[in-house]
Amino acid sequence: MAFADRVIKLNDYLLKQAANAKPTYKTVNGKRIAEKPVPVYLQSVANLCNQLLRSGTSIGANNAEATNAISKADFKSKSFIALKEARESLYWIDLLHRNGYLDDKQYQSIYADAEELVKILVTRCKKINQETLSKEVEKE
């Protein structure tokens, strides 16, 4: 849940930063041209933030669904979806950093949190797979 809260706050922060951005200009053949017009910049940030917002909040939602699963198959499915979303969040965080929307300190902090979630979920999913395999061996 705490990771989802961080993602929401980061989303709000980045969108506010983008909304306050000023265009940068360069001169080409004596004409002043906007290198990165604000609407284009704002749209880029919004798209990336939206992707992180979706994957980052989906981790907690799927984890809650797994915790309250109605069957073992449902628990397994939701756990693996949560892992997939956590890995996707790492991708979006990395992309935001590589494109200059997150500074090194912001990146390292939230990336470490997402990585920790991935490790926890990998452990859970491995355990689920081992239990499933053990039950299949018992049936034989």
Question: Which residues does each predicted region cover?
Answer:
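Short, C-terminally biased terminal segments at protein or domain edges
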Residues: 1-65, 69-140
